[in-house]
């Protein structure tokens, strides 16, 4: 409009100047000037109407922020949308807009951005400090009778400081309230005072965010992160009423994209938009009339990628959730039934880009509204012979890369069900069958003190992602048919010398030789990674309550070249501190130290030493010593601070 108006004014100016000549009469000039004035007046009125329409009507109908302070035009459209097509999308760039508007029938504002991904993974530009860990090996001959120090080897790598990614809960929950989605209407009776808490600025007293876990979506050039946002009516972090699953998208430099659509496959040969950030409509059981000890919703979601039968990677989450099952139903003579339920906390798996109608997988008695609502597709994971335990938690997922190569896709996801007396489950991604035992060291049951944290990354797959002479050497040395996985578990210690509980990360390495011979080859004791600790209660000490660092997920792991042309690896680990943060740590050189720089790496040796729990016992024993030392040093330093404060208060020093 402005361009057209400028063009018309220029044309009028040109004709006017050419007409106003010394020989022209005054009347002729007057007529031209009058005509110009009326035309300009009409054009100005038209422009004013256009501006008024765009400024008020579009703002009101598209949820845009009205700029009442005269800021620049782009601030008026600060909520513009970004639409990202995968880099392998079959339609040319020039036809993306038409596909979005006509095929997907989605609206676009002129300020929105639409493009095919061109971004690749970026090595984190952060500062590092050196760290050293010990790994206890289970691959040594006579390891069961060996001393722990004889099984230990040291490895060095670099770690960044934690980068916090907690969201603005006022903003996020305010939008959830204002959007008033079907899912919000269903779940909000569990937190009826949300609006009041927003108005009174009391969100931080009752709402918490933790368990951030993410994956790098290579085809989209973004990080997809899930986290747990939970509500506690009492404000006690160990007594949540309900946990919600929040999903965000970050670009390749870890900056959040606040209004983004990913054009993802729908599983039926077509595509659909997925909008982020958002709360996922999860199919969970809940009852606002019974809240005591129930802990409704999705707890501890961990995200990972699987390759489906259509050949693309899609995100799934593994989580635990409270639900109930009918145990008995009896009818009396009047036709009325008495139904008895049993409550469980079970492990579920959900496909973030797939849907289901209704939620009879968690609620066997559905209401009419529930039957027609759309939820994220989910599946309960049940042990063999339909054996459902009262409580299941902390399964550590991993993928069988050899199976993927043979089939072209992932038909199963595997879980380290138990670290001590190793047990591994194999659960189908394709049907509703129960899980089966992939491996059991013995028939002993019990979680033990070493428990699941992150997923385990398949190192064989990682080694295929980068071409380098050192990588070729390692692949040539690796025993045939050996698979290696590395993950981060956590040892759970109670009253070990600092607070009620202490959790820290423990690095673990799992290997498989042949079809089903698994061994937990290496386990580390507690690793602090130089992470600053947060108190459980803001106004208390570090050894009051719980002292926690929980590993949640391996966000990405990439290989590259270092400055000296040697191979280098970059791992991003997500953690939570004090059950109230979403943090990222960048780790450089962990795989390099364990696999490439160790000339005596037993991971590259073929041996048939039997499995035992000795390395786990050593790791837990060393972790316990870490806790006692940490508690003693904290108390000593705390006493010194108190003495110093008291001495200063008396005007003397001690």
UniProtKB/Swiss-Prot annotation:
Residue ranges of the TM segments: 38-58
Primary location group: membrane
GO BP terms in the entry: beta-1,2-oligomannoside metabolic process; cell wall organization; glycosphingolipid biosynthetic process
GO annotation, cellular component aspect: membrane
Segments in the Cytoplasmic topological domain: 1-37
Its EC number(s): 2.4.1.-
Keywords: Cell wall biogenesis/degradation, Glycosyltransferase, Membrane, Signal-anchor, Transferase, Transmembrane, Transmembrane helix
Topological type in the membrane: Single-pass type II membrane protein
Subcellular location: Membrane
Disruption phenotype: Impairs the elongation of beta-mannose chains on the acid-labile fraction of cell wall phosphopeptidomannan.
Domain of life of the organism encoding this protein: Eukaryota
Entry function: Beta-mannosyltransferase involved in cell wall biosynthesis. Required for the addition of beta-mannose to the acid-labile fraction of cell wall phosphopeptidomannan.
Entry's family note: Belongs to the BMT family.
Protein name (record): Beta-mannosyltransferase 2
Organism: Candida albicans (strain SC5314 / ATCC MYA-2876) (Yeast)
